[in-house]
Amino acid sequence: MEVEGEVREKEARVKGRQPETEVLHGLPQEQSIFNNMQHNHQPDSDRRRLSLENLPGLYNMSCTQLLALANATVATGSSIGASSSSLSSQHPTDSWINSWKMDSNPWTLSKMQKQQYDVSTPQKFLCDLNLTPEELVSTSTQRTEPESPQITLKTPGKSLSETDHEPHDRIKKSVLGTGSPAAVKKRKIARNDEKSQLETPTLKRKKIRPKVVREGKTKKASSKAGIKKSSIAATATKTSEESNYVRPKRLTRRSIRFDFDLQEEDEEFCGIDFTSAGHVEGSSGEENLTDTTLGMFGHVPKGRRGQRRSNGFKKTDNDCLSSMLSLVNTGPGSFMESEEDRPSDSQISLGRQRSIMATRPRNFRSLKKLLQRIIPSKRDRKGCKLPRGLPKLTVASKLQLKVFRKKRSQRNRVASQFNARILDLQWRRQNPTGTSLADIWERSLTIDAITKLFEELDINKEGLCLPHNRETALILYKKSYEEQKAIVKYSKKQKPKVQLDPETSRVWKLLMSSIDCDGVDGSDEEKRKWWEEERNMFHGRANSFIARMRVVQGNRTFSPWKGSVVDSVVGVFLTQNVADHSSSSAYMDLAAEFPVEWNFNKGSCHEEWGSSVTQETILNLDPRTGVSTPRIRNPTRVIIEEIDDDENDIDAVCSQESSKTSDSSITSADQSKTMLLDPFNTVLMNEQVDSQMVKGKGHIPYTDDLNDLSQGISMVSSASTHCELNLNEVPPEVELCSHQQDPESTIQTQDQQESTRTEDVKKNRKKPTTSKPKKKSKESAKSTQKKSVDWDSLRKEAESGGRKRERTERTMDTVDWDALRCTDVHKIANIIIKRGMNNMLAERIKAFLNRLVKKHGSIDLEWLRDVPPDKAKEYLLSINGLGLKSVECVRLLSLHQIAFPVDTNVGRIAVRLGWVPLQPLPDELQMHLLELYPVLESVQKYLWPRLCKLDQKTLYELHYHMITFGKVFCTKVKPNCNACPMKAECRHYSSARASARLALPEPEESDRTSVMIHERRSKRKPVVVNFRPSLFLYQEKEQEAQRSQNCEPIIEEPASPEPEYIEHDIEDYPRDKNNVGTSEDPWENKDVIPTIILNKEAGTSHDLVVNKEAGTSHDLVVLSTYAAAIPRRKLKIKEKLRTEHHVFELPDHHSILEGFERREAEDIVPYLLAIWTPGETVNSIQPPKQRCALFESNNTLCNENKCFQCNKTREEESQTVRGTILIPCRTAMRGGFPLNGTYFQTNEVFADHDSSINPIDVPTELIWDLKRRVAYLGSSVSSICKGLSVEAIKYNFQEGYVCVRGFDRENRKPKSLVKRLHCSHVAIRTKEKTEE
């Protein structure tokens, strides 16, 4: 009775908080029992069984009554929606009891818990026979409204309602069997609430094998087992705290067949029918697929080893198809599984891994077979139709999956755990969106593992895998920071920018259109005055630079080479982005591979190529003087050549020739002549030349345009007058005569990517061409259709009127371009492969030659010499691959027009010397730390408006000196600032010195170096000569008074003692015929003071100056002890970057040069002979030093080539030496090379390859009286002059010679220097490492 009272109290409490349920009529006792069962809260310790202690009425009820009570529950409508197959057959009680063990099967729980579209009952019952015991007792404390069960078993003695017996189609059946998605959540919440209210008595129970509901009659074995288990379940009074599952027998075969009903996207539900054979039948009418091994019961544990987790997983609403596909994870048709079916942490443990992974594929081969069975073949894909919401790669209409349990042998424990872990990771069930990164991080790595990874982290090692030059990368900055392990963020280096003012940009645009625009000199009076000052300043800078460089780098005035315009265009292709010695070697390879058949006499270099000289007119274009300027060693003249046409009209063509070449004549005739006196090959004027004025002594008449210029033209001789132009300084009037008529204004547009230029030509003769073009909007510019220019019309215009240029020896091609054009591009690329960028350059060269043939009919660009400079510039810019710098090189060096190319050397020098102002640099960046320099085009924008008024000769020499100065002194890396003659004006040097001195205060005026200079016999007081520091750290100018004060003599107190001469040698006394030794002091007589001639010739010879009048020499040269101690120069001096060879200058008529080509007339460099040291071989790096044992023993000469002592003795006895011939580069190139030979130095020679390998035996008597010089051999001019003093560099260019390559006279190809002549230190190190 006490128990019943407690039950009633609980019942009252529950009624107060739960809605009333419908009462079952006719069964009052059972109704109260079920109410007690419904509202009874079971403790969390045990909720596995029905509590019989709290339900006393249940002890007195028989099984029939219990079944009748269950049948009454079914009759109220709780079983509506169950499958028809399960309702038609009777199922024993034990099957109902054992069916709860299928909770671990995903198909009996989560995927079958789909709500169905049926009428829900307002009653809420505890014993829903459609639910498994696991679902019945495993509930939570939540309270929800009851939902109709999914599957209802037919109970004995009762039948379903009329609605259940109503036949329905497959689609309706699937809908009733599944339920609506919205009701699934409510029903599961209700079950959790019911489970939380139950109490399970602690009864011991026998392990029961799980059974599967199936259609038809059950097997006998299953029915017998069901009877036994049901009787045990009815009579048991005690249960264990922890019930253990029983594994099915391994021979038991179970398979599941699915039924898919294809509905709309919102009504896609499927019903599942469990057959008695263990299959799940689907409602589809298609054929069943073959059974496939699948992990259907992968989470059935081996036994109850721990308490079941109370909190369940989150539920999802995935259909049965997606849940099935989530197990296989096969891409688009992957099985989707809810989180409710995921195994717990205890189930994933390695201890139970065998039971968990029992039905999964053991390897990838079985997985492959599984996928082959699931994914249909092409035949099956054709006939199947998939719903819109499902993937269309697999057919999931019918799947018959089979699970086989076989007895297996015991495996290795370690291997099993490892494989189980791998398989578990591979088959881990995931959400549809995938596992988050945070979950992966937490599962994969622990704190200790992360700490270990950070300890093993190496930034240097990890940085190797990162791409370079990435702005977000972290790198170690410099060595000082690298030692401290400091990390700085990498930032891309930015180039400094030139500070361009608007006026400079305006004039630059005008100069790009025409050099004779009115606005070039300024738009107003103030601007004109400003431009005049700017240009005068830059003219002074240019002249000062040229004057200093002449002293150091030698004379580099204009001297024309042979070659055509096509040669120069191809030459600028090859000189892009590479050193000059590499590009020149590439061109020499092309010339050797495609030689030109010379029709001219090889000895014509010593003949006058224009031999018909009748008159030569000397023209001095200097307006200040009326006489010609003094001739230098190799002066340059402007020759006037006549070309007679059919009408006897003479077109005088201005060409360039040296003093050793003959000049063409001007025949006197009373006829019209078109004279081209401009040295830049532009038409100047049409002039009526009077024959009498040509022969007479008067001035040549000119038109009004050249009235000012005519004043400076005078006739020097009447019989033979030379036409000479002093172009070192040209008045501004000459520049205005660049062309006679104003050219048509053009608007030029350049496309760098496609390298094609088009222009819009506007013909307007009324308006001046110097007007500034109007700016167009971008839209109008895009809409305007650009027309291509007909360049062939420009050629026809230049050749019209019989003015076509005929090819001469000086304008002949140096390469057979037609043969090169017909050659395969790959062959051309292989020829210039040593230069680099060979494939791209080969394509550009061939495309350029094809363009000439296509547009002009021949490979000839000599007509560009006769067109206006602006037109020539536009045409060259239209060639693919030529930029502004390349075009300016062709115009200045080949067409001889006014231009100034700015290459990398010129741009770097202009910035360092301060010629080009830069925008303010960052505080931490100093001038000497600059690694990148402004864009060359911006440098040219600033320089060209200020240098455009210079003449072509000055611009040529300035350009030649600047590029050589950049190679020798002002290199990009480690410039030779100590020996630089321009360091007083260099900002780079000032910044480096100031940084080295840590910005010390400026030196005071008294901080100067004083040198006492004493005269030997003078009684005057010593004079102090003050040398200011070469570094100008301050720019303040001193007054003249201050300078004069510093030069005042200093009076010494006491005075320095005079030198005493106690004893003199007899040689110190002068001798005379009449008076011998009359003077005690040989230095008293001023007439006999030794005279030292400081010139080039006397400086190299040690002969005494002979007085021819007296017959004997009274002048003696005092040889100091220091001079006497200077050793004799060796034949070969090997250094790190260069090798010095003692060479002899060979005259042109020397017998040694028999078989060599005659030296070019314009070539100022002679042939040289380099002597071999006895015992040297071709590969000898150092002179031999070993001694011969055979010669020391019996004075017998050996026959070894490397024996120094024996070979020296043999050469001394035979009076012969071995030598190699050095050929002048201009002679080796036969006087023709692109870009006027600026690739080479003025004193450059090539080593004859034949005599370098097989030296020539030369008698010593033929060379003992020859002039001796020093030849510097190395890999490049920069490496040769690196680290030398300014005196050594000066001697190198003025007295010495440079050699960087060999030359094969047979095939005319460049060769590398043999090791005897020069071997780089890199090759020496490589050889030493190889020998070690």
From Swiss-Prot:
Keywords in UniProt for this one? 4Fe-4S, Activator, DNA-binding, Hydrolase, Iron, Iron-sulfur, Metal-binding, Nucleus, Transcription, Transcription regulation
Q: Which of this chain's residues are annotated to bind [4Fe-4S] cluster?
A: 970, 977, 980, 986
Q: Which GO terms describe its cellular component?
A: nucleus
Region named Disordered: 1-29, 137-242, 280-317, 739-810
Compositional bias ranges of the Polar residues kind: 137-153, 739-753
Keyword Heme: yes or no?
no
Bias (Basic residues) occurs at: 301-312, 763-777
Compositionally biased region (Basic and acidic residues): 1-23, 787-810
Q: Look up the record and name the cofactor or cofactors this protein needs.
A: [4Fe-4S] cluster
EC number(s) given by UniProt: 3.2.2.-
Q: Where is the composition biased (Low complexity)?
A: 223-236
Binding note for cofactor: Binds 1 [4Fe-4S] cluster. The cluster does not appear to play a role in catalysis, but is probably involved in the proper positioning of the enzyme along the DNA strand.
* Subcellular localization, as worded in the UniProt entry: Nucleus
Gene3D superfamilies listed in its UniProt record? Helix-hairpin-Helix base-excision DNA repair enzymes (C-terminal)
- Molecular function, one GO term: 4 iron, 4 sulfur cluster binding
**CDD domains recorded for this chain?**
ENDO3c
Q: Name one GO biological process term.
A: base-excision repair
Q: What is known of its domains?
A: The DEMETER domain, which is present in proteins of the subfamily, is related to the J-domain, but lacks some important conserved residues.
> Which PANTHER family does the UniProt record give?
DEMETER-LIKE PROTEIN 2-RELATED, TRANSCRIPTIONAL ACTIVATOR DEMETER
Q: What else is known?
A: Although strongly related to DNA glycosylase proteins, it differs from these proteins because of its large size and its unique N-terminal basic domain. The DNA repair function has not been proved and may not exist.
Protein name, as recorded: DEMETER-like protein 2
Species of the source = Arabidopsis thaliana (Mouse-ear cress)
